């Protein structure tokens, strides 16, 4: 995402009216999660600032009723939500953190032996389901006493090398909630055991922490969460996957094309400005269809 993210954390890029991480937090709250730990680093102070107390700002704003209602949603203390922050350390002699497994390990004392949710801050899950994805994952995790539950969705075969790909047990390959026999990190299309890609949402039990400590770093020196999950499976722990439904969408902000598409989706869904944006896009498309190479009106 460079140069866009040279000075702005990717998680703070706006999508519609809010930064990406704000959408993720609202998704967590919608599934009744109220104690949220952000694992960040020194380049991501803007995230902490975004979720800071808004009372001083409110005193200096002159807002009408609708604006006041919108801004008051940022008062997370009144909503019973607590935020905590810790930094993923960069070891001496290294130039970057040690990967997703190391980031999860930084939360061990915070979780205090209880099951917990992991949500990557650069991916949004849009859901039109009455029971959202994370709530279904939590219910499955508790019902099966799992060590790990992963969100997955189907990707085209040619894209498997961009994702972790799961291996359902033979009898459950089409199930919406299935047990896993394995997981591979970014396999080539001809080696992919399925088209079910990991979708940036996990639920773990405390078993994940010794699994992270047990696995060796990759050739790049990183500790991959995928390897720790495979270790859980190999040790006989229950690991499951819950599929996104047809009414759910993963918005993976990993490149500019995906970011532009996601922003357009959210702009069109805006309750106030969506119809105007749709009219504008129709004008732009009509103009381009008849005036190739000319600037839009």
Q: Where would I find each of the regions flagged by the language model?
A:
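Short alpha-helical oligomerization interface
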Residues: 6-10
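Structural beta-sheet core signal
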Residues: 38, 118, 148-151, 241
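Conserved core of the sugar-phosphate nucleotidyltransferase
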Residues: 124-211, 215, 219
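A short acidic, often aromatic-flanked loop/helix-cap motif at beta-alpha or helix-coil junctions
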Residues: 90-98, 157-158, 189-191, 248-251
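Terminal amphipathic alpha-helical/low-complexity segments used for targeting or macromolecular assembly
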Residues: 25-34, 43, 52, 175, ...
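Short N-terminal binding/cap micro-motifs at the start of the first secondary-structure element
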Residues: 1-3, 46
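Conserved N-terminal catalytic core of the sugar/cofactor nucleotidyltransferase
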Residues: 14, 18-120, 125-129, 139, ...
């Amino acid at each position: 995402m460079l140069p866009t993210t040279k000075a702005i954390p990717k998680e703070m890029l706006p999508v519609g009216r809010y930064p990406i991480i704000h959408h993720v937090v609202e998704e967590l709250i919608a599934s009744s999660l109220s104690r949220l730990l952000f694992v960040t680093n020194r380049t991501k102070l803007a995230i902490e600032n975004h979720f800071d107390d808004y009372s001083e700002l409110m005193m200096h704003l002159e807002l009408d009723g609708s604006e006041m209602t919108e801004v008051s949603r940022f008062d997370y203390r009144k909503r019973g939500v607590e935020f905590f922050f810790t930094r993923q350390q960069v070891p001496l002699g290294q130039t970057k953190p040690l990967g997703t497994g190391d980031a999860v390990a930084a939360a061990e004392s915070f979780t205090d032996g209880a099951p917990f949710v992991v949500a990557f801050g650069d991916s949004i899950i849009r859901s039109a389901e009455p029971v959202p994805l994370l709530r279904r994952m939590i219910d499955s995790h508790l019902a099966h006493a799992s060590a790990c539950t992963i969100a997955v969705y189907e990707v085209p075969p040619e894209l498997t090398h961009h994702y972790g790909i799961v291996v359902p047990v033979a009898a459950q390959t089409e199930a919406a909630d299935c047990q896993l026999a394995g997981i591979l990190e970014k396999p080539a299309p001809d080696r992919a055991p399925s088209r079910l890609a990991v979708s940036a949402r996990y639920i773990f039990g405390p078993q994940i922490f010794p699994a992270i400590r047990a696995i060796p770093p990759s050739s790049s020196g990183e500790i991959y969460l995928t390897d720790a999950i495979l270790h859980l499976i190999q040790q006989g722990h229950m690991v499951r996957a819950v599929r996104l439904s047809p009414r759910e969408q993963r918005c993976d902000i990993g490149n500019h094309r995906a970011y532009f598409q996601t922003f357009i989706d959210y702009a069109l869904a805006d309750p106030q400005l969506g119809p105007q944006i749709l009219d504008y896009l129709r004008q732009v498309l009509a103009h381009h269809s008849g005036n190739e190479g000319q600037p839009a009106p």
